[in-house]
From Swiss-Prot:
Organism in which the protein naturally occurs: Bacillus subtilis (strain 168)
Name of the gene: yybH
Coiled coil: none
InterPro entries, per the entry: NTF2-like_dom_sf, SnoaL-like
Record protein name field: Uncharacterized protein YybH
C-alpha cells in the first residue's frame, strides 16, 4: 500500500507539472476536497480541476511539486498521508510557502483504487491563518 500511494502521489505531481488536469482528476474521488489556499476550498472534480488551472496561471505555468519525507497512516480503507511537499516555480514572489507540511487523505474505492478525498497542501498551517 505504501509504495502504491507514493507512486500515485508522484503521478499526481507529474500531472500538475505537465498541466495534465484530466489525468490528475483520475486520482480524485467525485466528492473530493482541495484546499486551494487558506480560506478557499474546491469541492468535487469540476471545481478542483478549475482550481488547478488557476494555480497553474498563478505560477506562470511553471510549477514542479515534489514530495520529501512521507508518513502514511492506514486504517482499513483510509490512509492519512503526512508529507513534506516542495514546490519549485519561476515565480519567486509567491505569497504562499514553497515548502509545506501537507496532509492528504486517500480512500480505497469498491474497485480497489486509492483516490484522494482530501488534498490539503497547507497541512496544519491552516490553523494559524
Amino acid at each position: 500500500m505504501e509504495q502504491q500511494l507514493k507512486d500515485i502521489i508522484s503521478a499526481c505531481d507529474l500531472a500538475i507539472q505537465n498541466e495534465d488536469f484530466d489525468t490528475l482528476m483520475n486520482y480524485y474521488s467525485e466528492d473530493a476536497v482541495l484546499v486551494v489556499k487558506p480560506g478557499m476550498i474546491a469541492r468535487g472534480k469540476e471545481e478542483i480541476k478549475k482550481a488547478f488551472i488557476t494555480i497553474a496561471n498563478y505560477f506562470n505555468h511553471h510549477i514542479v511539486p515534489t514530495q520529501g519525507k512521507m508518513i502514511l497512516l492506514e486504517a482499513g480503507d483510509t490512509v492519512l498521508v503526512l508529507s513534506q511537499t516542495l514546490l519549485d516555480s519561476d515565480k519567486k514572489d509567491s505569497e504562499y510557502a514553497m515548502e509545506r507540511r501537507a496532509t492528504y487523505v486517500f480512500k480505497k474505492n469498491a474497485q480497489g483504487e486509492w483516490l484522494c478525498v482530501i488534498d490539503n497542501s497547507y497541512g496544519t498551517d491552516l490553523i494559524g491563518v
